[in-house]
Amino acid sequence: MMKLKKRTFLILMAALTATFASAQKQPLPEWQSQYAVGLNKLAPHTYVWPYADASDIEKPGGYEQSPYYMSLNGKWKFNWVKNPDNRPKDFYQPSYYTGGWADINVPGNWERQGYGTAIYVNETYEFDDKMFNFKKNPPLVPSAENEVGSYRRTFKVPAAWKGRRVVLCCEGVISFYYVWVNGKLLGYNQGSKTAAEWDITDVLSEGENVVALEVYRWSSGAYLECQDMWRLSGIERDVYLYSTPKQYIADYKVSASLDKEQYKEGIFNLEVTVEGPSATASSIAYTLKDASGKQYYRMPFTSSPVD
């Protein structure tokens, strides 16, 4: 009988230990994790704007006048809550009703549009304060007071983009956000002042599409954003779409130097990264002009597929 009690006690202790260990290993939400920098984002690259014709580059208005660029700035539907527990959980679904939501301007911080409070501090963390009953503890940030803004809007892809690649770009969102198109999670980003892009070609529908962002005021990334400035939140830079051919210039690098013997002759070097179907070569040409627009050099060349 004594052995039975001891065995029962040991089993109970083992169960409690396993439960405690399981509770201890619960993963942090992405916005609390220093490892969750981004998900499914395209690799960073130099700005490469697509045009219908090379002559369009010279036209007034720049890349925004390209037929393969679409701004998503303007009025978005918006819901704001004081903490993550109260956020609308499935607002990103196209069937979700947002008729009672307010409108908000994008780009624009939500504190500047009637939601929450802008906080100014110098070199300290704005959430390391008695007001939030929180002491800094990286990577954790206050949860009960971590405001969440839910953004939604619709868009239609131009007919001329059919059969082409389509990319969504968010130039700057503070501090952490998830993004969906037509109810499908594209990924997330935790770099407030850096652009993030996702290829949305395969999730688009003919007709109306729905894009949604769930934005958190604070994240583990906030520990890297402590400087003398106003602490604000929301979509504060441009949001847009652009379209490229299936085979496209993904990046390029220009470098200039002088010959190593006399240091008189200039050396121009251009590296171009082409992505897309690798079965065919790419025809590329570059033109070198001075500040007045005078053409000095034009060079066509062909890139070969690389395994």
Residue ranges, per PLM feature:
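Hydrophobic alpha-helical membrane-insertion signals
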Residues: 25-104
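Residue-level structural signal for beta-strand termini and adjacent loop
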Residues: 82-84, 90, 191, 254, ...
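Short, polar loop/linker segments at the starts of domains and inter-domain junctions
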Residues: 86-97, 114-124, 255
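Structural beta-strand segments of beta-rich domains
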Residues: 164-166, 264-272
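Short beta-strand segments of immunoglobulin-like
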Residues: 254-261
